[in-house]
Amino acid sequence: MPFEFFSNKGNFFKGNLHGHSNYSDGKLTPEDVCNAYIEKGYDFISITDHFLKMFNYPITLPELKIKNFTIIPGAELHTSEMENGELWHLLALGLNDKFKPPDQPNFLINTKSENIENLSSRLFDAGAFVSLTHPEWNGMTLKDTLNINNAHAIEIYNHSCAIECDRGSGVAVLDQILNYGKELNIIATDDSHFHIDDAFGGWVMVKSEINSEEAILEALKNGHYYSSQGPDFKNIKVQKGRLEVLCSPVEKIIVSGYGSASICKNKTSIESAVFNLGLLPQEKWLRVTIIDNKGNKAWTNPIYDY
């Protein structure tokens, strides 16, 4: 089926979907967090403070009215427990202060807290954009993810986890999910706390007609974006068994598919490539990664119908 990734109308807006202020365990005030991202040219952010009783269940929305900058209310929610006994972490963007908190006092396991199936479903039903977070850092397994049927995305890159403990990737868990047959988009984030230099390393580029909370959330839910550490996608087309990629200058363009399937084009300062999709398992999934000469990557959301 013919497919064009960025065919919706609008412009690309740059945003961070995961970060913290001193309303939970971050260093900066919400206003200072916003100003830091504004200075780096971001168009929107969500401050996702830890939604725990010890922090009074914050949904952080600074009283800032800044032209051309959007702040999306959100939180990082927690409940017990993952297969390895770790606490669940779940992003929810577009959350309002009427959302009933789970019974989770702090970062310790609470066996009486709400299960992840119920929490993720309530968030989804409340209209939030829901994402699984840092799967490599907290040892998430495929079995864990099968408990969640109401999520939009998973972090493919978490900058804070990458620089603090070299556990910032979500690729392995993502591909297991896709191989299993579940559909899930991806996001790159900072998870910034500003105690160290953990900001401005992973973001999303969302295509939308306007930069507003409602429009950005709708575009996220519809998958009208890509994730990046630096490189940019210009366009991606699928037609008659061919995939065409247009991008900023990079060193590698990689198409990954079911199992171990992949196709790669390597060339200095390459800005386009055409791939024969007959080399990939049909009617499964594919996704595209580009890597620049600094090793920075950008990722598309998975394509399922090709």
Predicted features and spans:
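A metal-dependent hydrolase metal-coordination microenvironment
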Residues: 2-129, 133, 140, 147-149, ...
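Short secondary-structure transition/capping segments
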Residues: 57-60, 143-145, 198-201, 268
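Short alpha-helix boundary/capping motifs
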Residues: 65-66, 151, 205-208
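Hydrophobic, Leu/Ile/Phe/Ala-enriched alpha-helical segments that form helix-helix packing faces
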Residues: 123-124, 177-178, 220
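Glycoside hydrolase catalytic-domain groove-lining segments
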Residues: 172-183
